[in-house]
Amino acid sequence: RRDSQGGKTVAIADCEPDVQKLEPLLVEKGRTVVVKLSPMLDIFSSLRELKYIRQIHVVAVNNECKELLVVLQKEIKSPSEGSGEVWVSCEQAVNNFLTEPFVFTYSQEKEAQCPLAGEVENYLYEPGASLLKAGPYRLLGTRFGVKKLHANSHLYTSDTLVDFPGRRFRVLEVSGFGKKELKQLLQGVDKANLTVRNFPASVAELRKKWKLKEGGDVYLFATTL
């Protein structure tokens, strides 16, 4: 999963052994082959480069993407796979407890319609790491009845709390990015957990600007509505 210089690789062709070259032999020798890939690899590139992928499992532990597993089969094994579509399973373990997998296909994601929120409601949701990696962003909205804050933010909101597969927050205050508004919002806050989604500044830049230390009980999200 690393090259000879110790750098992380992001393409199958950069990895050793070269699974793309070995794939015909693998599916010839084994009816079902599971290949463990680097979580740094792009899923859509993997789908283009590997011909016999039937399933993809994206595994996260304590909200960090750890494994990208692909199941290779030369022949389709069950009627449910008759369309030849690849099933993607997002699996998350938190404190040694495995949550319910989120299973989907990319055609389902393409057809899904997720409403956009006109404003931030009572609760805010951030998808778990495996979901952010796999990208079922529209389906999350339709399956859990939540709204996206923005088409490109991947943050969701709702009036009532739902059992969402990720981090869930009760919204206490919403502020614009104006100097006066921010001063009021950050009054008495010198430490906070800061997340940036679809925003023209990095976490490091905002920490420096707002003079915030990392950690504490306050969670701040900088995003575009």
Role assignments for model-derived ranges:
Residues 1-225:
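SAM-dependent transferase fold signal centered on methyltransferase-like domains
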